[in-house]
Amino acid sequence: MDFSDDDMIDNKSGEENYSYGGGNESDDYNDVVDTIIPSEKSYVILKEEDILKLQRDDIERVSSILSLSQVEVIVLLLHYNWCVSKVEDEWFTDEERIRKAVGLLKEPVVDFNGGEKDKKCRKVNIQCGICFESYTREEIARVSCGHPYCKTCWAGYITTKIEDGPGCLRVKCPEPSCSAAVGKDMIEDVTETKVNEKYSRYILRSYVEDGKKIKWCPSPGCGYAVEFGGSESSSYDVSCLCSYRFCWNCSEDAHSPVDCDTVSKWIFKNQDESENKNWMLANSKPCPECKRPIEKNDGCNHMTCSAPCGHEFCWICLKAYRRHSGACNRFVVEQAESKRALLQSEIKRYTHYYVRWAENQSSRLKAMRDLEKLQSVQLKELSDNQCTSETQLQFTVDAWLQIIECRRVLKWTYAYGYYLQDLPKRKFFEYLQGEAESGLERLHHCAENELKQFFIKSEDPSDTFNAFRMKLTGLTTVTKTYFENLVKALENGLVDVTHNEFPPDNETKSTQEKYEEYQDYEDDFLETQRLYDEALLSGCYYD
């Protein structure tokens, strides 16, 4: 099987990406990551030529074992998503069934070769099944089924399929009732070079996207892929040569030590439109007359809906104010208000975690830009002003790399904290998180603000700058230690925490009771919303 060296690779989109200048900066970043999340590298970064070699090796292996042509093997591997072992097992179990399933027929359905020995038959023209013109046998092309079509019609048919997208990889004979596969040899024979190259690109992409062992780097414009060889218990975070870090398992931004399920729930919650409905339920009530939502900021409970409605009602019980007794002590009202307060509390809790999650991501992206500026412009200025070589200034780069990775870890700990239900574990987690965050803020402030003074040329820079070097290096080391402790604890599921470590004083009991009350409510959250909506629409709170 031949592949064009000019094959291009389409990639999935990802988050904003920075290359941190040139040289070996991505290696520096990976070294910093390894200090926070120490693990053996269980993946390999693949270039396009590496992928092509792996693909050819698989094709040649199956071709040798099954004694099939490489064209036939490609059809088989495409059908089984490039799983070599499954192809071999299925083929030796029931070859006839597999041939029928993938369209590799042993005998043609239509045979125009019966008169091969008869010289007269060689001169008989054959009618094309698409344009119905007559052609000589040399102008007709067939796949394993034998249905005859002229090469011009074949070219038009296949080109259309390829232009339609990757579905062309499983293209069948043009005869509607025929399931015979169209192989790469036919495509190369009848299509133009440009079309054939596009088909080859689809085959290459299929090897990565349909297989289970390789994935593209999701960073925009990156042509690398990653082959993962770790176990299910190991971290799925990988660092591409383009400097982008992502989770190989779920293709999201790298999120260790937080698991993929938590990340998936968190991202879904952030995108879920029901959060808008929750806010409306918690912070507004429908006018009993026109049903438009009304938000009450402050003041008394006597509400007047805006024009053209003008309906006057009580904010507490929603009863028309002209029939209002001045007391709102019905149990159903108290129950509704209790649920509303619970929703408000949950919204505040979610907002607390979301804001900090988003702010750390924003700070991380800003730190990436600051590092890029430092490496591309400021290191040269700093070297000139402080009369020292750029290699002696690597500690500033290390500090920024540490900041970037710590911001990433801290960002995802807020998603972890949102779903952490065990109160003793939550206390210990928040302690570790707080220590790590405080250390990171000191490091970030030092790198961002205290470094600025040294871009101004000084007559005697050495003493002050050396003191700064020691401070920044020390903060980098301390912050790394804080985050190592945090990551290790989260990876172990905070197993070292026991309930005895946090005796249930009165305040803890109260918090526990409130938390359990919320959990009981959350288990039946959708049903509560439905009943609450029905109650509002039916007007049971103000009749």
Swiss-Prot record:
Record keyword Repeat present: yes
Superkingdom of origin: Eukaryota
Zn finger intervals (IBR-type): 197-260
Residues reported in the UniProt entry to bind Zn(2+) 4: C247, C250, H255, C260
Active site residues according to the UniProt entry: C300
Keywords: Metal-binding, Repeat, Transferase, Ubl conjugation pathway, Zinc, Zinc-finger
Region spans: TRIAD supradomain: 124-332
Comment on bound cofactor: Binds 4 Zn(2+) ions per subunit.
Region annotation (Disordered) ranges: 1-26
Binding site for Zn(2+) 1: C128, C131, C150, C153
Positions with a binding annotation for Zn(2+) 2: C145, H147, C173, C178
Binding site for Zn(2+) 3: C217, C222, C240, C242
Associated pathway: Protein modification; protein ubiquitination
Similarity-based family: Belongs to the RBR family. Ariadne subfamily.
Domain notes: Members of the RBR family are atypical E3 ligases. They interact with the E2 conjugating enzyme UBE2L3 and function like HECT-type E3 enzymes: they bind E2s via the first RING-type zinc finger, but require an obligate trans-thiolation step during the ubiquitin transfer, requiring a conserved active site Cys residue in the second RING-type zinc finger. The active site probably forms a thioester intermediate with ubiquitin taken from the active-site cysteine of the E2 before ultimately transferring it to a Lys residue on the substrate.
Protein name: Probable E3 ubiquitin-protein ligase ARI9
Gene that this sequence comes from: ARI9
